[in-house]
Amino acid sequence: MKFSKLASKLGSETITCSLEKINHLDPDIQGVAAIDEAKPGTLSYIEGAKFANYLKTTNASALILPMDETLQKLAGERGIGWLSSKEPRLLFAQAIALFYRPFQPTPEIHATSIVHPTAKVGKNVYLGAHVVVEAGVKIGDNVCIYPNVVIYPNVEIGENTILNANCSIHERSQIGKGCVIHSGAVIGGEGFGFVPTPEGWFKMEQSGKVILEDGVEVGGNTTIDRPAVGETRIGKNTKLDNLVQIGHGCKIGKNCALAAQVGLAGGVKLGDNVILAGQVGVANQAKIGDRAIATAQAGVHNDVAAGEIVSSSPAVPNKIYLKASAIYKRLPEIYQFVKQMKRKL
């Protein structure tokens, strides 16, 4: 594909393109690659000026650049085709989609799969080897279910959803349209509900359900527990990384992103567009407002206001954390100073 044709297929955020100025920079693009691994005939991208050194050495034939005239000039001097955007990473993601097509199996119900007579399976559905579909399950059109998936009774799965191999969807769970569940995930397993008694722990039955709204993606070995009563809900287009634990009764808003090893205790509520970085822990019943961010390994014990950024454990506003970190580095120096002052008293 000519670079000019590729550029025309990318998003509206493209502002400047070398093809408008230097017509001979219209290489053939045969694929995409990381900037440090790119070969002639590939497209790559640079997200910011701090990666300028890669531009000096890359073998890419074309680049997606930020709105930076210095980078544009350097690319032109090296004979590299380029286009600039306010969102270079987004455009590169779009470019990948032009070259990469995920594996799409031919619709069929494998001979070794087991489908209960009361289950309803839509059109153009793929059920791989050893899939188990229990009583009362409803599967929409164009759903793809890979081998060894187990779907418990009365589950509903929306159209165009993908369940990867070896995941489990427990009873009464509702999976929306266009969701992706990766291998090893457990959706709707029992929440951690036990009541202490003098004789030991009394098990509280978990009669609720899990609801994933449309466009939710759940990473490998992530678990989303159902509650004793009511529902655990994951909002539209929210993305969960691998190894995330969502406790019983949590309510997560739309367009949230939770990185690996995040853990939410029971009853946590997240607003829309919340970001939790790796290994963030959120305590029981805590509320986090819209657009809030918790940085890596934050321990959130209290509510977080909308738009706030918190860090550390226990979590504090990020500005306070940064100041405290600067002081922490100077503690040996401060200690020596205090020690000397005490001698003078």
UniProtKB/Swiss-Prot annotation:
Pfam families: Hexapep, LpxD
E.C. number(s) listed in UniProt: 2.3.1.191
Record key words, sorted: Acyltransferase, Lipid A biosynthesis, Lipid biosynthesis, Lipid metabolism, Repeat, Transferase
Reactions it catalyzes: a UDP-3-O-[(3R)-3-hydroxyacyl]-alpha-D-glucosamine + a (3R)-hydroxyacyl-[ACP] = a UDP-2-N,3-O-bis[(3R)-3-hydroxyacyl]-alpha-D-glucosamine + holo-[ACP] + H(+)
Active-site residues (renumbered): 248
Signal sequence annotation: none
GO MF terms held by the record: N-acyltransferase activity; structural constituent of carboxysome shell
Function description: Catalyzes the N-acylation of UDP-3-O-acylglucosamine using 3-hydroxyacyl-ACP as the acyl donor. Is involved in the biosynthesis of lipid A, a phosphorylated glycolipid that anchors the lipopolysaccharide to the outer membrane of the cell.
Protein name: UDP-3-O-acylglucosamine N-acyltransferase
Taxonomy of the source species: Bacteria, Bacillati, Cyanobacteriota, Cyanophyceae, Oscillatoriophycideae
Gene designation per UniProt: lpxD
